[in-house]
């Protein structure tokens, strides 16, 4: 079984009306790097995304579940599911299986009438904040965020901050590494991924190594 455990770095922040989410791309099995291009950031609706840390199979099942539930909600009601409702749905599901838990740590982020970031644990505990991080690299991420985060920072500054935070974790956490994955929830355009070229360009401008 391929295991991410918490050996990863994920982060989500709000920046004005935007939500920015990012991860590293290293998957580990104990001390072995099993995959250098593991997807950990998923779009789950037009204006919502989710990051994963934990058992790959458990996390992927939950991603598929949330995609299906949010699409069904949108088809039936002609509107997108509110982000707090999505977080509640996911946390309730996890709580119902807490004695046989999904071994995951999740971030759910998105925009409805305002930006949201929720951190959700394996027992279904759900906490909303202006920024959040999961995985073994999270202590290093929080160090950067607490020093440099500003609530109404621009989208450009927010993207750069997420890159800096993940890069800091990669430098100190051996279970985090390789390429970064970043996405933005735009209140007008919806969710989109940043291209690898743009991420590399920003790393160069920030004088950070991949």
Curated annotation (Swiss-Prot):
User: Its Gene Ontology biological processes?
Assistant: proteasomal protein catabolic process
| Domain of life, source organism | Archaea
Record keywords: Autocatalytic cleavage, Cytoplasm, Hydrolase, Protease, Proteasome, Threonine protease, Zymogen
Q: What class of enzyme is it?
A: hydrolase
GO MF annotations in UniProt: threonine-type endopeptidase activity
Q: Does the keyword Protease apply?
A: yes
Q: What is its main location?
A: cytoplasm
- Mark which residues the record calls propeptide: 1-7
**Subcellular location(s) per record:** Cytoplasm
EC number(s) per entry: 3.4.25.1
What reactions does this protein catalyze?
Answer: Cleavage of peptide bonds with very broad specificity
For the keyword Hydrolase, the answer is yes
Its GO CC terms are: cytoplasm; proteasome core complex, beta-subunit complex
Query: So what family is this one in?
Result: Belongs to the peptidase T1B family.
What is the purpose of this protein? Component of the proteasome core, a large protease complex with broad specificity involved in protein degradation.
How does this polypeptide assemble, per the annotation? Answer: The 20S proteasome core is composed of 14 alpha and 14 beta subunits that assemble into four stacked heptameric rings, resulting in a barrel-shaped structure. The two inner rings, each composed of seven catalytic beta subunits, are sandwiched by two outer rings, each composed of seven alpha subunits. The catalytic chamber with the active sites is on the inside of the barrel. Has a gated structure, the ends of the cylinder being occluded by the N-termini of the alpha-subunits. Is capped at one or both ends by the proteasome regulatory ATPase, PAN.
User: Mind telling me what this protein is named?
Assistant: Proteasome subunit beta
């Amino acid at each position: 079984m391929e295991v991410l455990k918490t050996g990863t770095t994920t982060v989500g922040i709000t920046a004005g009306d935007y939500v920015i989410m990012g991860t590293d791309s290293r998957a580990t099995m104990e001390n072995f790097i099993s995959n250098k291009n593991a997807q950990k950031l998923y779009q789950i609706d037009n204006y919502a995304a989710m990051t994963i840390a934990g058992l790959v199979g458990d996390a992927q099942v939950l991603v598929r579940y949330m995609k299906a539930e949010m699409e069904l909600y949108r088809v039936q009601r002609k509107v997108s599911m509110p982000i707090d409702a999505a977080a509640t749905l996911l946390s309730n599901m996890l709580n119902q299986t807490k004695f046989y838990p999904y071994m995951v740590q999740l971030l759910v982020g998105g925009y409805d009438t305002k930006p949201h970031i929720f951190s959700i644990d394996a027992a279904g505990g759900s906490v909303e904040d202006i920024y959040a991080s999961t995985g073994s690299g999270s202590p290093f991420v929080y160090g950067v965020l607490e020093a440099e985060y500003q609530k109404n920072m621009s989208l450009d500054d927010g993207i750069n901050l997420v890159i800096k935070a993940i890069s800091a974790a990669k430098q100190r956490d051996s279970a985090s590494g390789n390429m970064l994955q970043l996405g933005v929830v735009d209140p007008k355009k919806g969710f989109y991924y940043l291209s690898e070229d743009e991420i590399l360009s920003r790393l160069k401008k920030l004088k950070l190594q991949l």
